[in-house]
Structure formats: C-alpha cells, structure tokens
Amino acid sequence: MIRIELLSKDNFHPDSLDHYQRKQEVKKVYRKQGGEYILVDCAYTEDWDAGKRHSVAQTISGDDRITYLALDEDRVVGFISLLKQLEGPYMIIDMMQVSAECRGLGIGRRLFRRGKEEARKAGAEALYISACSSEETVAFYKAMGSKLTDFPIKRIADDEPYDLQMVCYLEG
C-alpha cells in the first residue's frame, strides 16, 4: 500500500532517492508554432544519474519547501515539492515525479491533490506548474484540471523555455 506523508527527518535522508527511477521514454512533445502548441515527434529518454538524484534529494528537503512523499514501505516512489513562498496568487510546484515502475497507479493524482490542499491552506488561488512538454506529462496536468496560463511567471518561463507554463485554479 502506497502512503503519502509529509517529508520529515524520520522518512527522508540524503540517499532516499538512490533507487528512484526517473526514467521516461518520450516520443512526442508540445512545441509552439504559429502561436499554438502542437505535438511534434521528438524521441529521447529523460533519466537521472546518481549525482542528480542526490541533488534533487537535497533540493526537495530544503526549508523553503513543502514536500510530500509517496512511500512504498520506506522506499520513495514519488513526490511533490512546493515552494512555501507564494508568487502572487500562485503556489509553485517546483517538482513532481512518480517513479517509472509506479506510474499509472494514481500516485500522481494523490500527490497533486495534496499540493492543492497546501495551496489552499497558504491562501493561493492556483497551483503554478512549469510542465515538461512531453505528451504524457501535459496530459496528466490537463486531466488534473490545469490549463495553459496567459500570465506566465517570466523567470520560470525563461529558465525552462520548452516547458509549458500551466495553472490549476483551486475550487472554492
């Protein structure tokens, strides 16, 4: 049974992501052409080496974040990391991942719901997502109620020019 817990010193340490499987085989991505996003062929593999996993572990356990873990026993199989500091009306999802072997099990939906709960508690109007442009990633965020924003946060959009800038407004 996968459980969702707030990251703490009791359930997370620097090597907690050592066996995490970021791997994603991407076939199609969204690209802006003529003012519209269209799907184009662009095959590549997204993955993390040991150094990247350690860097991510350090980042998501920072004091400036609220991070929830999806745990299978004591093994991290997913996480959502939100920036505590609101940016205007938005709480920013800095990272959200589900390990390759656990995708399609509803873990991402559960993590995203926790993100919405935290945003609501913080007084945000919406979650802000700089989404990887892969077909599957964008489909997930759309299924969760997110849409492209007309008002991207410039520094985030500039930092990730191929990402789609999305928001998910919180229901009353």
Go through each PLM region and give its residues.
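Short, Lys/Arg-enriched, disordered terminal segments
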Residues: 1-3, 171-172
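Acetyl-CoA-dependent GNAT
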Residues: 8-13, 19-90, 94, 99, ...
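Conserved acetyl-CoA-binding loop-helix of GNAT-fold acetyltransferases
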Residues: 98, 104-117, 142-143
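Conserved GNAT acetyl-CoA-binding A-motif
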Residues: 119-131
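Structural motif
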Residues: 122, 143-144
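Conserved catalytic-core motifs of GNAT/GCN5-like acyltransferases
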Residues: 128, 132, 147-164
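Helix-turn-helix
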Residues: 137
